[in-house]
């Protein structure tokens, strides 16, 4: 079985492409079934394994398969599933085999590959991906071991380095951008669309600025109400957004919608109602919540996750010592995992040896039982049984010794001595 990771992320693809390759949560389980069975070979000697990690900044397919064409098949499947031409998608895709796939998983979970260096949200997202793959029956020995090691490495990196300290989060970056547009955030009305973890983080940072008003609009009213109450804000129905958008100076959106929920026309009407006072908008969703054409409006300042990434990277540069320490830990753990992976290659051989030896044992025991039932002497039957087992079990090794010559024979002799530690050496003059 070979490990392989196929994916795109914020390093290789813009948000305009990432949003087209993202998987809504409810699609991941059925997608895993088709990915495994159709493209990773259901007739392979070993059952293929797969997991899908889909976040704002990355979509990745983790695989364990015997299929030598898995790389091409995975890219083709991703292209066909999302109806994106292969020629358009392929230049942005990375394919990481074996140790590269292991190293990548360790770095992702540790926050080293994130837009926000050292952020912890990705670890939870990866655990969710593993849970979903497990529920779909898509994980097996190889990926289970990979992800368990991945979580252990992430814990070690975060516990022994300062990779997560003093990081500039996406939420903090959004506040910094707002401060460039408005002299005082405390004078502004802020609307949050959604009620997930990212919106909660943003609300925390903006609430610390003491805005004039804080409002939460969410598809599930109760959840939006609970979040608003935490920050002494108000909740409003999401359906009221088109008619009330003009009331807000700052709008931050991050929902799980597969289509934009804020269109160009609605924003144009809001700008007109505001008499062209500026609106600061942050779209943290992938796929995007706000139509990109909105950013072309004169009085609208629209930023996406990629835009905020530039501010985040400014804070990343100061923690390179922690990065080097984390990379060293990861490299050691990658080597450890690859050693485990190497041992897995002998498992089929060992299993076959056990099966063959057991078949020989059963055959001789059956023969002995028939002799005993016939009334033969038990001692003679046991002697014959033991002699037959001995002869059959050493037949393979002795035949191999007789077939090889030269250096191969010397190597095989040394190997056999390791198996049968009491075997006499070739220079033994005892005559035995």
From Swiss-Prot:
Substrate binds at residues 55-58, 114, 119-121, 125. Keywords: NADP, Oxidoreductase, Porphyrin biosynthesis. Its EC number is 1.2.1.70. The record marks 104 as: Important for activity. Pathway: Porphyrin-containing compound metabolism; protoporphyrin-IX biosynthesis; 5-aminolevulinate from L-glutamyl-tRNA(Glu): step 1/2. The active site is at residue 56. It holds the Pfam family GlutR_dimer. During catalysis, the active site Cys acts as a nucleophile attacking the alpha-carbonyl group of tRNA-bound glutamate with the formation of a thioester intermediate between enzyme and glutamate, and the concomitant release of tRNA(Glu). The thioester intermediate is finally reduced by direct hydride transfer from NADPH, to form the product GSA. This is Glutamyl-tRNA reductase. It comes from Burkholderia lata (strain ATCC 17760 / DSM 23089 / LMG 22485 / NCIMB 9086 / R18194 / 383). The lineage of its organism: Bacteria, Pseudomonadati, Pseudomonadota, Betaproteobacteria, Burkholderiales.
